[in-house]
UniProtKB/Swiss-Prot annotation:
Assembly information from the UniProt record: Homodimers. Homooligomer. Interacts with UGT1A1, UGT1A3, UGT1A6, UGT1A7, UGT1A8, UGT1A9 and UGT1A10 to form heterodimers.
Parts of the chain that traverse the membrane: 490-506
Entry protein name: UDP-glucuronosyltransferase 1A4
Nuclease recorded as keyword: no
GO cellular component, one term: endoplasmic reticulum membrane
Gene Ontology MF terms: glucuronosyltransferase activity; protein homodimerization activity
Length: 532
């Protein structure tokens, strides 16, 4: 009995010693303000892992949404929107329809700008409603969050973080109008860094560099209608003039969904972290339904076809052209499509409303990937080493496709102009030409050869900001005027000195010349006068 007591006491001592040695871990509070649509898919993975590390997560989303739904690893707090579900769906439907209209007509351009204006107004009005919801703002203030995690493509989350005086972490692909470069004060020379949406590479001709330099000017109107309402709202809230850069410079860390395996080399700042491929991490087993499709494909394997979460219906004529092309290859095609079934759909093609894209791309029988070139799909293609046929539709997709094509890992087609034969030939090329597989496997090997996985890196930096209450180095460039940033005042000062020295030197030389040669000339002239 005495022995049993001693054993029990010894166990208690060991437990106390262990508790003394181990650091106390206390979960923090994370406020997430997501951008709806596909950006939420990456943010969602970070939220899942942050919750798994013992932190409380509150996701703040609008009542009217596409993808943001409550789940067991976060608490969803919704706020009222000044528009109905019907209004929102109608606007999004019009935007989808614009994708498949000729892009070079003036009418299409005007309609696109009008839809963008309406969408921007909905977003800014929704943000106004959120920030003027006094009970909700009071609740958020009292919750004492340690960090705000948001995508600054929609500036509402960044503005809310600044308004609550809470450190923020941005997770993004890019921001329109180079605002990500301005917000980080990262050098951005137009001579070799292609502007997003220009479809330029980092090796540009003279005319491409002209386009690259002028493109920000052409985007001014888009920036004005997209982001100026947020600057006005911020100025109203803070009772002083607040610029977009003021809002963005509040961020402690910027998590870019990029990787230099895909993107072109460029300067970066200390608080810029690259987590491209973050959506490749979580992979579940293939379901029996899709396992059956794959096993039935035989030696030819499968082709995965998806235009992303935003677009799953296309015009009937174009759908029939695509169906005809898919019937010309021996592979089994799994096509994520919710529209009307094309009447000419071949036996080798299966329509599904949803597919486990990342899991299917990782299967050894997958031969090719038909994608709209969204960043999620592109990185999943790279992670799994699958050559791609790219049908870019809008936004950064054209640039993503250009990057893959320049690396010899895929073929790009214009979805509006391509024929059935074009698509079939592109598929046969990337499947049968071994160079495409070799190039994508090389990219995959480079991308995966890293000390820390992208998802783990993202979670680390979120916790870093929580531990240190921000603590990111703030570039002094934020405190400079535009002419100080470009050293124009210094250049002007030095130029003034050079001109002054040159002027004084010239005057001195002129004076000396006059003294030395002017007098001699006058003497000679006087001598000649006496002779005559």
């Amino acid at each position: 009995m005495v022995l049993g007591v001693w054993i029990t006491l010894w166990r208690l001592v060991r437990l106390l010693l262990l508790l003394c040695v181990l650091p106390w871990a206390e979960g923090g509070k994370v406020l997430v303000v997501p951008m709806d649509g596909s950006p939420w898919l990456s943010l969602r993975e970070v939220v899942r892992d942050v919750h798994a590390r013992g932190h409380q997560v509150l996701v703040l989303g609008p009542e009217v949404t596409m993808h943001i739904k409550g789940e067991d690893f976060f608490t969803l707090q919704t706020y009222a929107t000044p528009y109905s579900k019907e209004e929102f769906d109608q606007l999004m439907q019009r935007n989808y329809q614009m994708i498949f209209k000729p892009q070079h007509s003036l009418k299409t351009l005007l309609e696109t700008m009008e839809n963008l204006k309406k969408f921007s107004m909905l977003c800014s009005r929704s943000c106004w409603e959120l920030l003027h919801n006094k009970p909700l703002i009071k609740h958020l203030n009292e919750s004492s969050f340690d960090v705000v995690l948001t995508d600054p493509l929609d500036l509402c989350g960044a503005l809310l973080a600044k308004y609550l005086s809470v450190p923020s972490v941005f997770l993004l692909r890019f921001i329109l109008c180079d605002l990500d470069f301005e917000g980080t004060q990262c050098p951005n020379p137009s001579s070799y860094i292609p502007r997003m949406l220009t479809m330029n590479s980092d090796h540009m001709s003279f005319l491409q560099r002209v386009k690259n330099m002028l493109y920000p000017l052409m985007m001014k109107y888009t920036c004005h209608i997209s982001y100026d309402p947020y600057a006005s709202l911020a100025s109203e809230l803070f009772q002083r003039e607040v610029s977009l850069v003021d809002i963005l410079s509040h961020a402690s860390v910027w998590l870019f969904r990029e990787d230099f395996v895909l993107d072109y080399p460029r300067p970066i700042m200390p608080n810029m972290v690259f987590i491209g491929g973050i959506n490749c991490a979580n992979r579940k087993p293939l379901s029996q339904e899709f396992e059956a499709y794959v096993n039935a494909s035989g030696e030819h394997g499968i082709v995965v076809f998806s235009l992303g979460s935003m677009v799953s219906e296309i015009p009937e004529k174009k759908a029939m052209e695509i169906a005809d092309a898919l019937g010309k290859i021996p592979q089994t095609v799994l096509w994520r499509y919710t529209g009307s079934r094309p009447s000419n759909l071949a036996k080798n093609t299966y329509l599904v409303k949803w597919l486990p894209q990342n899991v299917l791309l990782g299967h050894p029988k997958t031969r090719a990937f038909i994608t709209h070139s969204g960043s999620h799909g592109i990185y999943e293609g790279i992670c799994n080493g699958v050559p791609m046929v790219m049908l870019p539709l809008f936004g950064d997709q054209m640039d993503n496709a250009k990057r893959i094509e320049t690396r010899g890992a895929g073929v790009t087609l214009n979805v509006l102009e391509m024929t059935s034969d074009d698509l079939a030939n592109a598929l046969k090329t990337v499947i049968n030409d071994k160079s495409y597989k070799e190039n994508i496997m090389r990219l995959s090997s480079l991308h995966k050869d890293r000390p820390v996985e992208p998802l783990d890196l993202a979670v680390f930096w979120v916790e870093f900001v929580m531990r240190h209450k921000g603590a990111a180095p703030r570039p002094a460039a934020h405190d400079l005027t535009w002419y100080q940033y470009h050293s124009l005042d210094v250049i002007g000062f030095l130029l003034a000195i050079v001109l002054t020295v040159a002027f004084v030197t010239f005057k001195c030389c002129a004076f000396a010349w006059g003294k030395c040669f002017g007098k001699k000339g006058r003497v000679k002239k006087a001598h000649k006068s006496k002779v005559h």
